């Protein structure tokens, strides 16, 4: 008998290859705005973006601030002119067109799991971007529902997004729920905050600093 009757998945870098999609979308955005997408420039953006996402996950800023500031800070850092808000909008549109899967086995694994458990997605991504990427990737063929933080009004690792997802799915016994994701800070900590078992998707065998322990 299966232990888990409900499995919640993160989206980016768990089911969908966000790194590949980001590389494509960022390159397309920089080229569109006349900025050379060399390694140093790309890393400058990523450093700014990652710091803002960490602040978001800690509840220090809201999503609107992240989207409104990341490209504005980037342009200021590289001393380039432009509208950061408009640049962010263009980037999100480009990102939504890249539904790359993490690997060729993703859909087969989801197909098998969907036969024994209810599957759903809990994502911190942007509503428009994630809805399109998930649909075009084929992932949604196996999902009961998808819960995206922008629409839900809270971000992982806040337990409220998991609470709302489980209510919508009609799940009461959390002993039979598993959260799967690549991020210790949002997925594993979030699942733990909600009283769920967790599985750290770690294909690159990164070291766990030990602060957040998956079950």
Where on the chain are the PLM-derived regions?
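Asp-based, Mg2+/Mn2+-dependent phosphohydrolase catalytic module
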Residues: 1-7, 20, 31, 107, ...
């Amino acid at each position: 008998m299966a232990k888990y009757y409900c499995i919640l998945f993160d989206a980016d870098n768990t089911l969908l290859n966000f790194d590949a999609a980001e590389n494509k979308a960022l390159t397309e955005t920089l080229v569109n705005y006349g900025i050379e997408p060399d390694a140093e420039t790309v890393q400058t953006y990523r450093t700014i973006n990652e710091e803002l996402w960490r602040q978001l996950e800690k509840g220090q800023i809201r999503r609107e601030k992240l989207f409104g500031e990341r490209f504005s800070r980037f342009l200021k850092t590289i001393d380039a002119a432009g509208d950061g808000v408009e640049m962010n909008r263009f980037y999100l549109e480009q990102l939504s067109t890249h539904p790359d899967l993490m690997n060729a086995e993703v859909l087969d694994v989801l197909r098998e799991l969907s036969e024994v458990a209810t599957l759903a997605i809990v994502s911190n991504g942007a509503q428009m971007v994630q809805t399109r990427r998930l649909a075009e990737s084929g992932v949604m063929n196996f999902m009961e529902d998808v819960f995206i933080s922008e629409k839900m009004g809270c971000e992982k690792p806040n337990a409220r997004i998991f609470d709302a997802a489980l209510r919508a799915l009609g799940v009461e016994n959390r002993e039979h729920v598993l959260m799967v994701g690549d991020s210790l800070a949002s997925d594993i900590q979030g699942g733990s905050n909600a009283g769920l078992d967790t599985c750290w998707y770690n294909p690159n065998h990164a070291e766990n600093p030990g602060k957040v322990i998956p079950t």
